[in-house]
Amino acid sequence: MTSSAGQRISCNVVETRRDDVARIFNIQRYSLNDGEGIRTVVFFKGCPHLCPWCANPESISGKIQTVRREAKCLHCAKCLRDADECPSGAFERIGRDISLDALEREVMKDDIFFRTSGGGVTLSGGEVLMQAEFATRFLQRLRLWGVSCAIETAGDAPASKLLPLAKLCDEVLFDLKIMDAAQARDVVKMNLQRVLENLRLLVKI
């Protein structure tokens, strides 16, 4: 792979927000499929990849977006003045910014479920490594509460972002998306060589 291609698909420079504020698009409670026990999953917004099969396409853009649900639209035209005036809720905002303190308060509401089920908190996306500094600080706080931590990641970021975060986790759900280097580069926009090297480093932790 040429250095220019590596730059094009890198997520080295994507992280632009302050490290005490994250951009998320959902908090899902009572999940049974994102790690051990009952888990609360925080979905981070923003992903450097373009997987055709993406389960959360609303997570790809790092921007806060507004979408219209056609089935809810009354065709009243009030949105022409201001989308926030929509009486039927046809307009939905995808994404919001949240502080460390606010997110900690939000997930700790579920602490009783974590303790009784052996569950905890999973950080997903999008791609959590695009907001690695925030995620690391957040998991450090959860560790002080004794909460089990996990991340779900495609692993396509510098090891300096991945490894400090992974060392705070009880589980790393590593989403190895594709094993063909050309398709990884051209279709998914992924640096497969870096992904595999990060996986090798993870298994040594």
Sequence positions of predicted segments:
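Short, charged low-complexity linear segments at domain edges
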Residues: 18-38, 46-67
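Auxiliary Fe-S-binding modules of radical SAM enzymes
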Residues: 1-38, 105, 203
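FAD-binding FR-type
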Residues: 72-75, 96-102
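Short, intrinsically disordered, charge-balanced linker/junction segments flanking boundaries
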Residues: 62, 72, 79, 200-205
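Conserved AdoMet/S-adenosylmethionine-binding subsite of the radical SAM
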Residues: 101-104, 108-205
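Acidic/glycine-enriched edge-of-secondary-structure segments
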Residues: 88-95, 182-188
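Cysteine-centered iron-sulfur cluster-binding motifs in ferredoxin-type domains/subunits
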Residues: 41-54, 66-89, 127
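Short aromatic-glycine motifs in intrinsically disordered, low-complexity regions
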Residues: 8-16, 83, 88-93
